[in-house]
């Protein structure tokens, strides 16, 4: 706790007493340190450095092929650069006598190819974070990419439970059964406290939010408790433990963080993650300070704070001290040699693993797959993108090649397309697209086999059910955001976003869809890449009972029962080529496989498609210019919304009723006044 220094009042007697003490102490060799504090309060300073959503980006990236040690380049992030930035701030703060905490708000795992090492028995990310001196991390949704059992193995490999002494893993609203390894081995904790050098006691807890928990594919028996109720309990426990300052490490997103701050008093700081928001200024919700540092290690967050020992208030000091809230991690930072050595060690292991799972076709994450002079972009949000088209085309054409059967439609969700694909820009890397860049964008998840990446599944749906898919994606993106936006190959459609939802029932928060947000849908019947000019399309009509061959990410299929249980009018029945229903508990029957039984992964399809592009003069495949932009596959239009028509009809009805009532009253009055 804080020690409060008395405030001396200046008077003649006091000056005499002090003078006497100083004279005596000078003879006795006693040194007395008298501190003066402005005003009538004492403040204790401390600093929180923070990251979130680093997604296994151990090396500088975007593009990774541009990075060369010691050279200026446009690549961002990298654990060794980040470590240098942290060390520099720690050194400065140490000279000033100011303690520093280093925190990560989850999703340190999953996304870049280094995450694949988890399946090979390594815990690269967390071991490096320990070496960098992280005080605490929380568990996000992507730590569950390979399932709760694999997460437990990962934490054990990282040295837990003993490693809590280095880096606490806080997951306060996570509830694993007592016999599950996560709980049985004490692999996560509910709370933690840090006694800082200046006497300040900081309490911390970690939560995963509603949206983050919802997008986890597989948790087994692990459950997530109500975030707000858990937070209230954690705040109370930490106060009982004597915490001066309470920090919530939250993997929830800014909107949920603001809601948490409104609903749960006593949280001084929320260090956030999940929505990949770069907050260049802190958000103040009531008295709670909210921060977030973007994603992929592009920034290190720096939050300068002061704790008032008299009032218990915490205030932000960044503006007065002038450090930015976010520090770009770029080539201006050299690599910490110890951390860089660890990264290089794991890179060699990853290269050997890639050689194994690609049957020797690739043996280095920096192997060139193709070339382009443009970025295959994954933005803007909630819109057709060039990368979305490239990925879905890859899925459609490669499955067609694998099976020998025409694939009518391929679809993939934005949530599983992680990042734009950046070709190299330096003299040594110009135009190069490496294996790393492709897998970084498409290599999340795993299937039922032991290999990384989400498998591709093949289903047959009626034309009416394809319309249901379109209506469902419009509904999900409306309520749950960009991760649920679907990209398509072999199809184009137009829709009015204002018609996705007719209304929402307030008490149960249940959306009532119009099922008429899609204004038109067309199937591409030509060969090769679908045209931009409208040639080769036929209408895909509502009520069409013909079967169409659709391929998608198997993970995506698992969301169908969740939606159709709530909205049976949008029912989708997954079928095989003979039209026979195949329930999703038999999803293995729907997965596309190699001749040896291995699953065909999304990332594999994209790599195969990239290498199949026509070669340039240097013999390297060149990505078609078609993918430099979008192709008019998904078109947003604006028409008068259904709810507007409904309101208009109600107004007409009410007006008619009022008119009839007034007319009847007028008629009655006329009858009463008529002479007898």
Language model segments and positions:
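Acidic, metal/ion-coordinating pockets
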Residues: 34-332, 387, 391-394, 410, ...
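Intrinsically disordered, low-complexity segments enriched in small/polar residues
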Residues: 2, 11, 27, 37, ...
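Catalytic centers of hydrolytic enzymes
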Residues: 39-51, 56-60, 64-85, 131, ...
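Secretory targeting signatures
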Residues: 2-33, 653-659
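Generic alpha-helix initiation/capping and coil-helix boundary signal
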Residues: 13, 19, 224, 361, ...
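General secondary-structure edge motif
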Residues: 22, 108-109, 218, 285, ...
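Short secondary-structure boundary micro-motifs
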Residues: 4, 120, 177-179, 266, ...
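Charge-rich, low-complexity amphipathic helices
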Residues: 1, 22, 151-152, 159-160, ...
